[in-house]
């Protein structure tokens, strides 16, 4: 049976493709989810993609990942990246390998975006690669899990 990973997207990521396309590009959340599913499958993994604008829902999914023995997490916490100690604590608490990803280069933007509570709970962080960052995140997560690319 294939290992499962969760790809969690936070607030406003449902607006990808229409929200500030000069920063986030024109790809939609559906495009991200398709990319994640295809990339994960290439390593024999199954990606379960979820998005919520609510911090508590994201925390519930992180907790669920532990109870369902999910192998790894990719998270784009959106604006909660810079504010949510609760998300940090949830990630630390479940002890599941996690990669943080952001579509834009948060360090080339406003100062308040330069701090991440998520990064301290993740083994890797990626930003500025557009939606390709998700492919890179899953590739790195697969390597951490010992999953090899399938033919």
UniProtKB/Swiss-Prot annotation:
Question: Pathway involvement?
Answer: Metabolic intermediate biosynthesis; chorismate biosynthesis; chorismate from D-erythrose 4-phosphate and phosphoenolpyruvate: step 3/7
Q: Which GO terms describe its molecular function?
A: 3-dehydroquinate dehydratase activity
List UniProt keywords, sorted A-Z.
Amino-acid biosynthesis, Aromatic amino acid biosynthesis, Lyase
Task: Report whether Transmembrane helix shows up as a keyword of the record.
Answer: no
Which residues are listed under the site Transition state stabilizer? 19
The reactions it catalyses are: 3-dehydroquinate = 3-dehydroshikimate + H2O
Indicate the residues that form the catalytic site.
24 (proton acceptor), 102 (proton donor)
Q: Which GO terms describe its biological process?
A: amino acid biosynthetic process; aromatic amino acid family biosynthetic process; chorismate biosynthetic process; quinate catabolic process
Binding residues annotated for substrate, in chain numbering: 76, 82, 89, 103-104, 113
Q: Report the coiled-coil segments.
A: none
Q: Which InterPro entries match?
A: DHquinase_II, DHquinase_II_CS, DHquinase_II_sf
Q: What is its EC number?
A: 4.2.1.10
Protein task: Catalyzes a trans-dehydration via an enolate intermediate.
| Subunit-structure text | Homododecamer.
**Which HAMAP family does the protein's record reference?**
AroQ (MF_00169)
Question: What family is it from?
Answer: Belongs to the type-II 3-dehydroquinase family.
Q: What is this protein called?
A: 3-dehydroquinate dehydratase
Species of origin reads Rhodopseudomonas palustris (strain TIE-1)
